[in-house]
Amino acid sequence: MFITFEGIDGSGKSTQIQLLAQYLEKRGKKVILKREPGGTETGEKIRKILLEEEVTPKAELFLFLASRNLLVTEIKQYLSEGYAVLLDRYTDSSVAYQGFGRNLGKEIVEELNDFATDGLIPDLTFYIDVDVETALKRKGELNRFEKREFLERVREGYLVLAREHPERIVVLDGKRSIEEIHRDVVREVKRRWKLDV
């Protein structure tokens, strides 16, 4: 079970991934929770660079890809050991943020993602959709990833991906309550994996 959570900052994805991890663990599932960028020792160093330093859009993409490649090795191992792997951001983030947000192009980012991940695709992705205004209010601050026009392009990128991959990407209305969104997440996970819990 490989599940990713996507959305612009302030969408509530990090809250939902924690709630799903708790839900699965209470029911005896082995769960590993990771985030991007980061998730490995070197990946966390890359995360620090991305969050604290100004880099070009292409350099930003390659740093994300390097972090992702390191993490995929661990993810494959966890999956082979029967863990449910829950990941806060993955390839869809690069397509949305770098492909659409930074205008590097959807196709090139998808090709590079495929190369960096050896083609590892999540079984299920939850995209928590909120409008940019709501997300910015929730965050209460702007960093360089969160300029309004940029986030509008990112959001559009996510919506394009959701339309292209409806079998994998479930769009959830992020304006609803945390509990309502969690119920939908659990319902979908139970449906996909025929869980009786």
Swiss-Prot record:
Classification via SUPFAM superfamilies: P-loop containing nucleoside triphosphate hydrolases
GO-annotated cellular components: cytoplasm; cytosol
Keywords on record: ATP-binding, Kinase, Nucleotide biosynthesis, Nucleotide-binding, Transferase
Molecular functions per Gene Ontology: ATP binding; dTMP kinase activity
Domain of life: Bacteria
Pfam family, one: Thymidylate_kin
GO BP, sorted A to Z: dTDP biosynthetic process; dTTP biosynthetic process; dUDP biosynthetic process
Disulfide topology: none
Record: residues binding ATP: 7-14
EC number: 2.7.4.9
Annotated catalysed reactions: dTMP + ATP = dTDP + ADP
Family: Belongs to the thymidylate kinase family.
PANTHER family tied to this protein: THYMIDYLATE KINASE, UMP-CMP KINASE 2, MITOCHONDRIAL
Job description of the protein: Phosphorylation of dTMP to form dTDP in both de novo and salvage pathways of dTTP synthesis.
Protein name, entry field: Thymidylate kinase
Species the sequence originates in: Thermotoga maritima (strain ATCC 43589 / DSM 3109 / JCM 10099 / NBRC 100826 / MSB8)
Gene name of the encoded protein: tmk
